[in-house]
Amino acid sequence: VGFKAGVKDYKLTYYTPSYETKDTDILAAFRVTPQPGVPPEEAGAAVAAESSTGTWTTVWTDGLTSLDRYKGRCYHIEPVAGEETQFIAYVAYPLDLFEEGSVTNMFTSIVGNVFGFKALRALRLEDLRIPTAYVKTFQGPPHGIQVERDKLNKYGRPLLGCTIKPKLGLSAKNYGRAVYECLPGGLDFTKDDENVNSQPFMRWRDRFLFCAEAIFKSQAETGEIKGHYLNATAGTCEEMMKRAVFARELGVPIVMHDYLTGGFTANTTLAHYCRDNGLLLHIHRAMHAVIDRQKKHGMHFRVLAKALRMSGGDHIHAGTVVGKLEGEREITLGFVDLLRDDFIEKDRSRGLFFTQDWVSLPGVLPVASGGIHVWHMPALTEIFGDDSVLQFGGGTLGHPWGNAPGAVANRVALEACVQARNEGRDLAREGNDIIREASKWSPELAAACEVWKEIKFEFEAMDTL
């Protein structure tokens, strides 16, 4: 057949409602808002084309390959309830389109170019189904939940953390002092904030040294294993690795990375190093809201969470749920399960568009952090369960008596909630009573309860189904 130049509708090639998806296909669910006058089939096909083999006109080199083998296909379109102009377009991509073990390449293909497409008003990637054949090309988290518990020798409860504040401006020695005040009080971890890298007021090497001293002193005093998330994020991969190597030489248990600002290539590199060298890896999601906050455009956090599990990280920040609306709770628990479990069933009520099988890729601990304090402890324990990290920054350092009593208050509250749950009490209903009872035995907790008794952060949820 001779080459026929010209422009033809995408849907003639890329909209294939009769296509039966394969177990090896990567499946994507896009929320598409077409421009007025663009039919949904054409918009869905355009997304499939521009994120796989297509371009705006017919090219003669199409004849040199088998497009049927390599093209993305829009195989199903459904309306979005309550939204006249939005549709969910399901696209299947053949596995051959993607480099093995590269989240970078996967995202460059699926979300690389198509989001600036003129025929679309807005486009949001709601979910991805990663086939087991592709999952198996990734190392995933350096260690995973069970190995981390064994390393730390901590079982049967959530882990407790605290972000050191003020996040910027402390000298290395004062920073280390704050770490030392928190850890002996009962916290498992303290944390660098996401933007603590190596600034003029505190260079990274000084911070690492003082924090390591605080960790080892706390361990000697308490008999518990302690850690501080040393942020290795840097301007170059080489510098990042230099910091991770120094952390390993100090003998500390965990380092940290900002995976979105640092990038997936850097993150996967660091995750491989951490597995080879016995370091845990804490992941902060700085910049995520730029990508995931708009309901119509961008990418849902559940996709970023799946990508992180593939790229590698042992902890990741996942929101708090507390004080927010019910729908948001279900959505958050949906991606928390995606992080922790081996096999997650499709469940649209929780925002899960596909069934995901991780074939024993290690799990990631979700981290609840941001605006939480002792009164939230029962709800957090109930919502997140044991396999989580609860992080109280201001909720530790803001204690009226100082950092160490703040740490004690959080640990007492947590142990009280875990004990009450194990005795069969209902944390959702009796939470406040449980905290009040515990505070009779702990003056530190009583003082914390008094300070934060009225604080709430309640706004309407951005993220609805």
Swiss-Prot record:
Required co-factors: Mg(2+)
Q: Which PANTHER family match?
A: RIBULOSE BISPHOSPHATE CARBOXYLASE (PTHR42704), RIBULOSE BISPHOSPHATE CARBOXYLASE LARGE CHAIN (PTHR42704:SF15)
The identity of this protein, by name, is: Ribulose bisphosphate carboxylase large chain
Q: A single GO molecular function, which one?
A: ribulose-bisphosphate carboxylase activity
Give the taxonomic lineage as stored in the record.
Answer: Eukaryota, Viridiplantae, Streptophyta, Embryophyta, Tracheophyta
Q: How is the cofactor bound?
A: Binds 1 Mg(2+) ion per subunit.
The record's annotation in Gene3D superfamilies points to:
Ribulose bisphosphate carboxylase, large subunit, C-terminal domain (3.20.20.110), RuBisCO large subunit, N-terminal domain (3.30.70.150)
| Anything else known | The basic functional RuBisCO is composed of a large chain homodimer in a 'head-to-tail' conformation. In form I RuBisCO this homodimer is arranged in a barrel-like tetramer with the small subunits forming a tetrameric 'cap' on each end of the 'barrel'.
Known catalytic reactions: 2 (2R)-3-phosphoglycerate + 2 H(+) = D-ribulose 1,5-bisphosphate + CO2 + H2O; D-ribulose 1,5-bisphosphate + O2 = 2-phosphoglycolate + (2R)-3-phosphoglycerate + 2 H(+)
What HAMAP family is this protein classified in?
A: RuBisCO_L_type1 (MF_01338)
**N6,N6,N6-trimethyllysine-modified residues are where?**
K4
Subcellular localization(s) per the UniProt record: Plastid, Chloroplast
N6-carboxylysine PTM positions read K191
Q: What is its main location?
A: plastid
Site-annotated residues for Transition state stabilizer: K324
Single GO cellular component annotation?
chloroplast
Q: Which residues bind Mg(2+)?
A: K191, D193, E194
Q: Name one Pfam family in it.
A: RuBisCO_large_N
What family is this protein classified in? Belongs to the RuBisCO large chain family. Type I subfamily.
Describe its partners and assembly state. Answer: Heterohexadecamer of 8 large chains and 8 small chains; disulfide-linked. The disulfide link is formed within the large subunit homodimers.
Q: Which residues bind substrate?
A: N113, T163, K167, R285, H317, S369
Catalytic residues of the enzyme: K165, H284
Enzyme Commission no: 4.1.1.39
Could you provide one GO biological process annotation from this protein's UniProt record? reductive pentose-phosphate cycle
Biological source species: Cornus officinalis
What class does this enzyme belong to in the EC scheme? Answer: lyase
Q: What biological function has been recorded for the protein in this entry?
A: RuBisCO catalyzes two reactions: the carboxylation of D-ribulose 1,5-bisphosphate, the primary event in carbon dioxide fixation, as well as the oxidative fragmentation of the pentose substrate in the photorespiration process. Both reactions occur simultaneously and in competition at the same active site.
UniProt keywords, alphabetically: Calvin cycle, Carbon dioxide fixation, Chloroplast, Disulfide bond, Lyase, Magnesium, Metal-binding, Methylation, Monooxygenase, Oxidoreductase, Photorespiration, Photosynthesis, Plastid
